[in-house]
């Protein structure tokens, strides 16, 4: 089949994490801030020890697991402490939101590709709502014609 325009099929796909934005740095900073507040409010470990336990939990459960701080208090205290869990979760999310920024060249690159007639998409490993949250918070969601996550296709 002949194509009318060879440019009709020009597509560029991006990942979200560590491609459009630096998730590794903001996640580490947010986790350390959460641990600091949890320790300051009664988690009986020093900050480095507590962060080490949290990193072990994240390695075991995966970064998309939603109850890292619950498990942390269970491991350290022998039971879940809702106040400490809430402090950890709220601090993590507040710091994450404050630091969530696209890489410096992201917006210019997306604008350029769109201006050149490229269709843009996202293929990303993660929970669909979390990936969309990042795209919306970064205000880049409107650049993308398609967003596909591992959760949607049943992959891990």
Model-found features: residue ranges?
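Substrate-recognition "cap/lid" segment bordering the active-site pocket of phosphatases
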Residues: 99-101, 127-156
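Short polybasic/polar patches that bind polyanions
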Residues: 39, 74-75, 114, 136
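A metal-dependent, Asp-based hydrolase signature
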Residues: 45, 56-91
């Amino acid at each position: 089949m002949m194509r009318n325009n060879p440019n009709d099929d020009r597509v560029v796909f991006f990942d979200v994490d560590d491609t459009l934005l630096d998730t590794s740095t903001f996640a580490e900073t947010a986790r350390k801030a959460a641990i600091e507040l949890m320790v300051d409010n009664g988690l009986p470990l020093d900050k480095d020890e507590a962060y080490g336990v949290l990193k072990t939990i994240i390695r075991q459960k995966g970064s998309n697991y939603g109850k890292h701080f619950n498990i942390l208090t269970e491991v350290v205290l022998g039971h879940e402490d809702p106040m400490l869990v809430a402090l950890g979760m709220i601090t993590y999310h507040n710091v994450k939101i404050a630091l969530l920024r696209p890489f410096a060249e992201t917006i210019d690159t997306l604008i350029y590709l769109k201006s050149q007639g490229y269709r843009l998409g996202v293929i990303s490993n993660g929970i669909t709502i979390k990936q969309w949250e990042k795209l919306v918070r970064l205000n880049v969601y409107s650049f993308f014609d398609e967003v596909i996550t591992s959760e949607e296709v049943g992959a891990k």
